[in-house]
Amino acid sequence: VTTDPLLLTGDVDDATTRLIRTAARFDAADLAQPSLLPGWTRGHVLAHLSRNADALVNALTSARTGELIPMYASTESRTADIAAGAPRPPEEQLDDLRRSADRYAEAVAAMPAPAWAATVQTRRGPLPASLLVWRRLREVEIHHVDLAADYRPRDWSPAFGHRLLHEVATDLAARDDAPALVLRFDGTSHELVIGDRAQAPVVSGPAVEIAAWLTGRSPGATLTVTPDGQLPHPPEWI
């Protein structure tokens, strides 16, 4: 996946189209079914994706204007908005998903080139504006899987899987609760190391499948562990 936000917009558009296609098939009973996220229904996931699009509009507007605009008014309001949006009828969910995605796309289109160099404030700290489009792609692709419909990590592109794997491995390497791991993907010449290599089992497999396992979106049944044994348990990641 490219790091150029403008080139990534096409990937976001395609991912959004796939997401909306899935969401359009849900009736009220489907939306009330559990998602892959503990405590969240499919309705919660869709409401979150809509509010995430609007939060990114705030971040993009902040980068473009120089005004300090928080992505969310507060953690409490973010949680409340998702809870309030979860039980809505299917047609309202779908309309919100489409309209919020359109607002996000318009905010990206309004960005002048210099604005991508700005730094914006997110819930997890400062972030270059140039990474906001990737963040939206990541949200849509991962949470599409969380809908527990027919979209799986195997449907992610290899480029997306590679970038996600590198990002997650980098994040986990900075955490104290992550197990030591050597991640060997797409052949023995490509690997990432988390923690003390000398104490780490080697987990091997396609990059997409390792990324899905590390993010908790797959049990990793197709991965191999050397020396033989069970896969370690990575900590929760988004």
Give the predicted meaning of each segment:
Residues T2-L7, T61-M71, A110-I238:
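Structured surface interface patches that mediate subunit assembly and partner/cofactor docking
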Residues T2-D11, D30-N52, A80-Q93, V120-R138, ...:
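Alpha-helical scaffold segments that form or flank carboxylate-/histidine-based iron centers
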Residues P89-P112:
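Ordered, amphipathic secondary-structure segments that act as subunit-interaction surfaces
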Residues T2-D14, R18-R21, S62-I82:
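Soluble acyl-CoA-dependent acyltransferase catalytic core bearing the H(X)4D motif
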Residues A15-R18, T22, N52, S100-R103, ...:
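Amphipathic, well-ordered alpha-helical segments in soluble domains
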Residues R21, H44, H48, N58, ...:
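Residue-level signal for well-ordered alpha-helical scaffold segments within enzymatic catalytic domains
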Residues G43-S74:
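Conserved alpha-helical segments that form or flank metal/cofactor-binding pockets of metalloenzymes
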